[in-house]
Amino acid sequence: MRVVCIAAGCVGLLTTFGTMPTIAAKVSNPFIQQEAARADASLRQRAEAPMTGAALLRSESTYVGLSSAPMKALPKEEIAFPIDHIIITSSEPVFRKYKNRLEGYEHNRIGSNGVTFLQKQLQEQLLADGYVTSQVVVPNQDLHSGSLIFEILPGYVEDIVLTNPKARINWRSAFPVRPGYVLRRQALEQGIDQMRSVPGQDIKMTIEPGTKPLHSIVKLTVEQKGFVHGSLMLDNSGNKSTGMYQGAVFLSFSQLAGLNDVLTTSFTKDISHHDDGHGSKQYAVSYSVPDGNRTYRISTYKYSYNQLVFMPNAFRSSGTTQGTEFAVEQVLNRTSRSKTSAVAKVIHKERHNYLDDVELGVQAQHTTAVEVGLSHRQYSGNTVSDVYLFYRQGINGLGAQVRSWEGLSDNPTTLYKMAGLEGQVQTGVRMGYKQGMYTMRFRSQFTDQRLFGTEQFSIGGRYSVRGFSGEETLRGDSGYYVQNEWALPFRKQQVTPYVGVDIGHVWGPSTETQLGNTLVGGVVGVRGTVGDAVNYDVSLGTPIKKPEGFDTDTRVWAFRGSYQF
């Protein structure tokens, strides 16, 4: 039975927590930080993977709007009229934003060809903005008045129907548009992305004329390949003291409520140790459901570890970390080349550390943080950029337990204020006679406060700076890393060799006694697929730059294999 170390018995730990930690703190804090960083990175990658694949299926518009194209000259005509005002009207308020789009052509002489030219210009602007069934018409008028009037006739959605009505799906939860709404391509694409984010589900859309003028019927053909999907994974991303080789099982359950919802579960465990006192395991569950332009997601996980420590007498160090996160994402703006969303999160974590089944009460943590952010995806030629800018703040509420000494006398605090930037840029590059791919991934956090180890930024390992094993890391209250990778896909053989160079840097009050602040590493590897179910990634990394005295292997092998079913 575990015994909790109460406050009266932990005075020594409490008085030295902010300056010179005891042996117990030395053993557990760095390790938990390292393991928590690895677990958080893997959870983040699993959460992002399905959405990334769905979004990349979108195609860009070939239309160029007036705002992004150079202004074209009016055609010269013998019969023309002086026009001082160009008026654009519509029965729908959404088109009021176009009322000044042609004002640059005012105070010119315009004839019949000029009217047709301007009508075409405005029509192309509507197409570029996604109003693919709305029309620009020229009503009867007298140009001697000095005014030229265009009218935008809105195109509407008459109905949205499933071509296979027996499909286990509700399109209303995915699409931010209903019958009677003005038809806009971006709203339909948002619904398609929401439906494609469901594993094993694909959708094709056609727009057909409706039964009334300027009305269209949107037909959806949904292909569903089962409602349960899974994968088995094996890698060597673990720690020597708790299990280098990690095995994982992932299961996803789609359409439980028929709302394009997804329940994802995973179980990860070391397969290196059995009954020798070492080991680690992790459970994770997440559930997401769309609501048109909004997506709700809740996730929870629990991570635990055991290890034997010899300092100099043997004892068992163990710990648990569990967390719950609730997130809401709202699309703010979507064009043919970009999507911008607002994100809000509430994050709660609990951590407990033990020595020989005795809980170190002073190290127990119950923390809560709120986060707001902006995410942006941009398409530019053959380049796709994803950026997420966030602000996160620890709060004293919603289950958090804040101690009175936090933040005093250089002690760390859970009531931190932090900003961060993360994302990736992917673009095609020529490599000899073949088309290659360059990818830059980056992540950062910035604060001027001293943080607990589990909130610090960690570098060194496959999830940050490759070329390092992750057994030893550099940590700081603030930091960043950038991963650069050049890949050359051989699509016929389903093999992609790659080479990478990564850099990371940390700083802040907690780095005062650290060996250094910067790591640079390199990696060469190959990833690919075998058939439709097996994926693999094998690489060899090496340190390029590290602080003197920083202990790490000169060659770091990494592998990951998975089987999908």
What is the role of each PLM region?
Residues G180, D235-S237, D270-H273, F310-F315, ...:
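Extracellular loop and loop/strand-boundary signature of outer-membrane beta-barrel proteins
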Residues L251, F326, V524-V530, N535, ...:
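Outer-membrane beta-barrel "beta-signal"
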Residues L214, G243-G247, G279-Y283, T320-T324, ...:
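Residues that define the transmembrane beta-barrel architecture of outer-membrane proteins
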Residues H352-Q494, V499-I503, W507-P509, G561:
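C-terminal outer-membrane beta-barrel translocator/porin domains of Gram-negative envelope proteins
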Residues L234-G238, Q255, F267-H273, D291, ...:
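Transmembrane beta-strands of outer-membrane beta-barrel pores
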Residues A25-G238, T268-K281, R441-R443:
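Periplasmic polypeptide-binding modules associated with outer-membrane biogenesis and secretion
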Residues I203, V228-G230, A257-L263, G292-I298, ...:
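Repeated loop/turn-to-beta-strand initiation elements of outer-membrane beta-barrel proteins
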Residues G230-L232, L251, L263-F267, Y296-T300, ...:
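Membrane-embedded beta-strand positions of outer-membrane beta-barrel proteins
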